[in-house]
Amino acid sequence: MRFSANISWLFPEVPDFPGRIKAASQSGFRAVEVAWPYATDRTLFKAALNTHRMSLVLLNTPPGNIEAGELGLAAVPGRQDEFRTGLNEAVSWASDLGCDRIHIMAGRVPLGLERQFIEKEMEETFIENLQYAADILGQAGMVGLLEPINSLITEPRYFLNTPQHAASILHKVKRPNLKLQMDLYHWQIMGGNLTQNIKTYFPLIGHVQIAQIPHRNEPDSPGELNFMYLFDLLQDLGYQGYVGCEYKPQGDTVKGLGWMEKYLKNCDGDEDKTK
């Protein structure tokens, strides 16, 4: 199993992304992922990756106007041009930094509107934008990822909130370089049944993220999920991608990484599986 440090969440004690890349390297990671790197000087970000021999394995499309309540634009009607501009920016960053996976953020139901009245239009917009994105990403040799985000705790207005909905969209778009981003935190909240859902949707999964339920902390913190079992299940199914550590450290990030050290020590073989 290979783990990547989500530097938008881990190492909050370090003030900037280049510093967090260094901290992740010193903590045993060989890869990082990030939500939105766009406010950081790209030259400094790239230099940190190169200096510490780190891979960037995932970034997100720009969120739009966060202050106006936006969290992605791919499914928001009337914002197609802005989505495409943001996608081009994400592809530019990813190409320059050697990243081959981009999370295409669907976005929220627009303020003042009810889901039931706009859901059909949002799905049509999402499919249109995903078809466009798949072509652009395909030309760059990249994979686009769809992540369901739970609507019960985290994002009540987010358009895409269950693996079933995401899988349905993927089947309608029918593009091989579009995959499912499985965040086990969100999947557990939106129905659980993880063993069966992981097996059912495994052929679609292109990236995995983790956090414990209910407080979104380290995998070995008190909560609902047995991550040692889940890691073994993924490995048994043949998962070869990265597992992104997208959780809120309870305290010092490094002190909270004992779960990873324990798991890797228990793995068979001598290979460093963080690589």
Swiss-Prot record:
Its EC number is 5.3.1.22. It comes from the Eukaryota. Pfam families: AP_endonuc_2. Keywords: Isomerase. The keyword Isomerase applies. The active site is at 147 (proton donor/acceptor), 246 (proton donor/acceptor). GO terms for molecular function: hydroxypyruvate isomerase activity. It catalyses: 3-hydroxypyruvate = 2-hydroxy-3-oxopropanoate. InterPro entries: HyI-like, Sugar_Epim/Isomerase, Xyl_isomerase-like_sf, Xyl_isomerase-like_TIM-brl. One of its GO terms (biological process) is glyoxylate metabolic process. Belongs to the hyi family. Catalyzes the reversible isomerization between hydroxypyruvate and 2-hydroxy-3-oxopropanoate (also termed tartronate semialdehyde). This is Putative hydroxypyruvate isomerase. It comes from Xenopus laevis. The lineage of its organism: Eukaryota, Metazoa, Chordata, Craniata, Vertebrata.
